[in-house]
Structure formats: C-alpha cells, structure tokens
C-alpha cells in the first residue's frame, strides 16, 4: 500500500482546509508513512465541507460520518480533529438512521446495490473506494490513481437526492453525469 510522509499529509490537509487547492496532486513519498487510508480518511472528513444540502434536509451539527462493514481506516480517523463531524462504524446490516455520510469500503462490494438503495432512501451522501463506484451509482469515489488519491463525482446520483457540490471540489474532481 502506498504511503504518505507526515509533511505531505499536513500539506494536503492544509490545502483541503483552505479550499482543497492543489492538495490532491501532492506526490506520495517513501519516508515515515501515513497509509493510503490515512489520506482517504482526511478526504472523507473534509468532503462534508464541500457538499450543499437540500433545503428540506439540512444536516445536524456535528455530522455523523458512518462506515459500514469492516473499517479500512484503522486508527486514522481517531487522529482527525472531529469538531464538525463524528465517525461511527456500523456492522452490517447497519443502522443508518443517524448518518449523513456513508463510506462503503471494498469489503462491502458484493452488497453495494443494497447499501446504495438504503442510502438513497435516507438521502445520505455516499462515498467509497470500490473501483467504478461512481459509475455504479455512488456519489463520490476515492480511487487510488497511481500515487495519488483522486476524486470522482457522480452529479446525477447526488442531484437525485438533492445534493450539490462546491465549485472548488468539482474543478478538482473527475465529474460524471449518469
């Protein structure tokens, strides 16, 4: 699994906080490591700041970001300052009643259709690193693209539930409309 140096991680996190900037293009390094999932944990957390919610579905504060099934982030989530959101792991079948964001890990790929249906019925923002997630109807995919973590956004899926994304995020992401 690729790794990130703490300075690269800090630089990327700072860029994300300041409007994402060029942080998604920072090269991975070989020194002291932070895992691929450490970077994805930060993105999962920061994405909540770039989603516009429908008027009839305003989220509570703090947000609850849920991970279903096996948590791929390990202890990376515990290292993130959680002032605007909390993380919860939900074992399948998973109670999603208090969730606003739903991360569906690769370990749940065979149940993807079920999770997407449940998330749509609850109007949750869906995020995953399952290959092809956005093409399959998920809202935000976090693929590993060489040595970078990318972002793929399916605007059609998001709009179906009334969500829209900040223009800064859309400029940095690969956007599909299906």
Feature annotation, model-predicted:
Residues 2-18, 24-178:
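Short hydrophobic alpha-helices and adjacent helix-cap/hinge residues
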